[in-house]
Curated annotation (Swiss-Prot):
Keyword Nucleus in record: no
Any one cellular-component term (Gene Ontology): cytoplasm
Catalytic reaction annotation: hydrogencarbonate + H(+) = CO2 + H2O
Cofactor(s) needed for function: Zn(2+)
Active site: H61
Alphabetical list of PANTHER family matching this protein: CARBONIC ANHYDRASE
UniProt xrefs under Pfam families: Carb_anhydrase (PF00194)
SUPFAM superfamilies membership: Carbonic anhydrase
Protein name: Putative carbonic anhydrase 3
PROSITE patterns reported for this sequence: ALPHA_CA_1, ALPHA_CA_2
Domain of life: Eukaryota
Gene: cah-3
Function recorded in the entry: Reversible hydration of carbon dioxide.
Family per record: Belongs to the alpha-carbonic anhydrase family.
Length: 246
């Protein structure tokens, strides 16, 4: 199922009908079950301070930005990753109110939104590394300043516009040394189990008005996307590791 699908639970193409497996995402992070690992090897973010530009699209399911990559590719490595991974896109998940929206949950609770920075393996392109950032309500919304300026142009499905001078570093928390790590899947069809997940423990703030702009974005049926998060999946035999880089 990579064609038509929806987030509506009652829809015949809804989350209950999506592909499944033993290592699916998202998951609930139960702090009582997490293993802590201290290390000197943190994640390295390359060219995350360099401004990038590209197309941002309403694809009918989310708002997604695909960078126009030139010589200075945003990349990540270290922190337990098995290779260098290069950014290919980032997108957002949100809910119909400020009490829900994130895909991953923490102790069963959701943040109002979640950002996914999707990276593809340079050596083995069949693998992905997704960095998840919880977005919490606050007075400061610098992390979404670029998106805030253009979301009004993306209400209709399949619309595209340009964004300039995006600094990915502004979308990351101040503390990048503490994160949860587990092996999982894409959270949308085909739900392929090819993803190494990194979820920062520290959220980034966004404003209520910014979240409201996302809720005006429409799906392919011209209905506002009130929520676009997949229900949490069973952990099964997997472990969640809390990595702290000293």
């Amino acid at each position: 199922m990579t064609g038509h699908w929806s987030y509506c639970d009652d829809d015949e193409c809804g989350p209950n009908r999506w592909p499944t497996g033993q290592h699916q995402s998202p998951i609930n992070i139960d702090l009582g079950e997490v293993e802590r690992k201290d290390t000197h090897d943190g994640i390295k973010f390359v060219n995350y301070d360099h401004p990038i530009q590209g197309d941002i699209v309403n694809n009918g399911h989310s708002v997604q930005m695909t960078p126009e990559l030139r010589s200075e590719h945003p990349e990540i490595y270290g922190g337990g990753l098995d290779q260098v991974y290069r950014l290919v896109q980032y997108h957002f998940h949100w809910g119909e109110n400020d009490n829900e929206g994130s895909e991953h949950t923490l102790g069963g609770l959701r943040y109002p939104a979640e950002l996914h920075l999707v990276h593809q393996g340079v050596e083995d392109p069949g693998k992905l590394a997704v960095v998840g950032v919880f977005l919490q309500l606050g007075k400061e919304g610098k992390a979404l300043s670029n998106e805030e300026r253009v979301l009004g142009k993306l209400c209709n499905p399949e619309t595209v516009t340009r964004v300039e001078n995006v600094r990915l570093s502004e979308k990351l928390p101040a503390n990048k040394r503490s994160f949860w790590r587990y092996e999982g899947s894409l959270t949308t069809p085909p739900c392929s189990e090819i993803v190494t997940w990194t979820i920062f423990t520290e959220p980034v703030t966004v404003t209520h008005d910014q979240l409201e702009l996302f809720r005006q974005v429409q799906d392919i049926e011209k209905r506002p996307i009130k929520k676009n998060y997949r229900p949490t999946q069973n952990l099964n035999d997997r472990k969640i590791v809390h990595i702290v880089a000293n």
